[in-house]
Amino acid sequence: MRNRLLSLVTLFLSLSVATAVSASPPPKAGLPLQQELASGSALVTDQNTGKVLYSRNPDLVVPIASITKLMTAMVVLDSKLPLDEVLPIAISETSEMRGVFSRVRVGSQISRRDMLLLALMSSENRAAASLAQNYPGGKNAFVKAMNAKAHALGMKNTRYVEPTGLSLHNVSTARDLTRLLVASRQYPLLSQWSTTPEKTVAFRHPNYTLGFRNTNHLINNKTWNIQLTKTGFTNEAGHCLVMRTTINRSPVNLVVLDAFGKYTHFADATRLRRWLETGQVTAIPAAAKAYRLQRDRERGLGQPVAQAVR
């Protein structure tokens, strides 16, 4: 009888627990799934509040390729050197330029303004190298100014060794580059030059003209409102993209680094915009995912989890 009573009590308690569990509130409905990216690191923040909207490995130190040129242009503007001064295309002080193809002829001349335009709009390496070589004190003084500016902006994990981004030793993080994007708001010419769709530039000595286009094809997409942009690529850095743009009617800073494929960084930006505006998750191609996982393993990252605040 006693054993039977104990069994009934146990059964009653089990049913009570089960009922309590089943009656507990379900997970909140409507929470969006997390968007996966093909890029190794990324960060999206609200320009007005600084709130993080999406992040993936934001403090991972990686090569940044031609994203470097944003700092190059900023240092030139800080110098207050005359923008209409005509300068020679000179690259001898930047050893990374050896063997790098360019349509721009060494020794020909354009204005400092046009050099800045070409460096930002079409990522012209000879223009960026020439800006440094025509700086007071030359390339070495210029690189010193780049690193001093990074330090002043609180870019603690950033280092520059040359002005083009060709060196794998030009490194930064998504978080540091977000600080650079924030600072760029004080330089309206950076926005103007970096978002110019295309331009024909006239060179002197000898006289010739060349047409250039923006390296970010999203500039021509009317569904995007881009205030500033810069792309970058080297084998070591992968495909990189930074933008000041508008998502969900709010101004944001967007950084994606080390993406696989010629258009993957643009696709990741589009995935992020769609997800932030609608909650819709978009799959990434298998090849792009395999590349990202391989890069993660090479860096000992395992399976980092993206985080977001929505």
From Swiss-Prot:
One of its GO terms (cellular component) is periplasmic space. One of its GO terms (biological process) is regulation of cell shape. Belongs to the peptidase S11 family. The keyword Cell wall biogenesis/degradation applies. Its main location: periplasm. The active site is at S66 (acyl-ester intermediate), K69 (proton acceptor), S123. It is found in: Periplasm. The keyword Signal applies. It comes from the Bacteria. GO terms for molecular function: serine-type D-Ala-D-Ala carboxypeptidase activity. Substrate binds at K230. This is D-alanyl-D-alanine endopeptidase. Keywords: Cell shape, Cell wall biogenesis/degradation, Hydrolase, Peptidoglycan synthesis, Periplasm, Signal. Transmembrane segments: none annotated. It is an enzyme of class 3 (hydrolase). It comes from Pseudomonas aeruginosa (strain ATCC 15692 / DSM 22644 / CIP 104116 / JCM 14847 / LMG 12228 / 1C / PRS 101 / PAO1). Pfam families: Peptidase_S11. Cell wall formation. Residues 1-23 form the signal peptide. Its EC number is 3.4.21.-.
